[in-house]
Regions:
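Aromatic-lined glycan-binding groove of carbohydrate-active enzymes
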Residues: 2-57, 61
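Mid-to-C-terminal alpha-helical segments outside catalytic/metal-binding sites
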Residues: 2, 10, 20-21, 45-46, ...
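Short leucine-rich amphipathic alpha-helices used at interfaces
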Residues: 58, 89-90
């Protein structure tokens, strides 16, 4: 429908769906866009000008954000393709499958290899920018409650994985 072309400042936030699906979905949408734009769609007929000037992936990188609730390392492996600045971490609290009460362990497991800048972005700075949060006002709370990079950069030892958890955050297989 071209809504992002007509409204380039519109922001669309998809939550509770993770982000692992994004690269393949955008690749398929771009392929369909290219086929429709070139007329190579077999027996289907599309009106002239039905496609947007740019492929769907262009608008996704410009307008879309992904709420990665209870993200695991496999969930974030393609973060550079998606755009780290487009990913918003969420604990999924108070849902049964959320990270609580093992949130700090989940954060260490998921983000220890992401690097400090990417981790800070996904854990809060992206949301702060998107929603125009006052970071100075939030700093005392963050300093008191938030985990440090020194804490998050330490991988979990095998004996630290929670035994009775319902979150996907500790998933290690693709």
């Amino acid at each position: 429908s071209g809504v992002f072309h007509r409204f380039p400042k519109l922001k669309y936030i998809i939550t509770e769906s993770g982000c692992a699906w994004v690269p393949e979905t955008l690749q398929r949408l771009d392929m369909a866009w290219k086929r429709i734009s070139s007329g190579a769609v077999g027996e289907f007929q599309f009106a002239e000008g039905v496609t947007t000037p740019e492929p769907p992936s262009f608008y996704a990188k410009q307008n879309c954000y992904y709420g990665a609730s209870s993200a695991s390392p496999p969930e974030l492996k393609d973060r550079d393709v998606i755009g780290t600045e487009r990913i918003l971490w969420g604990s999924d609290y108070p849902h049964y499958e959320g990270t609580y009460p093992d949130t700090r362990l989940a954060l260490r497991h998921t983000f220890n290899t992401c690097g400090e800048d990417d981790t800070r972005a996904m854990l809060g700075l992206n949301a702060a920018k998107l929603y125009d949060f006052d970071l100075e006002a939030l700093k005392p709370i963050s300093d008191k409650c938030g985990p440090t990079w020194d804490e998050l950069s330490v991988p979990l030892a095998p004996d630290e994985f929670p035994k009775d958890t319902h979150t996907n955050a500790f998933r290690t297989l693709d």
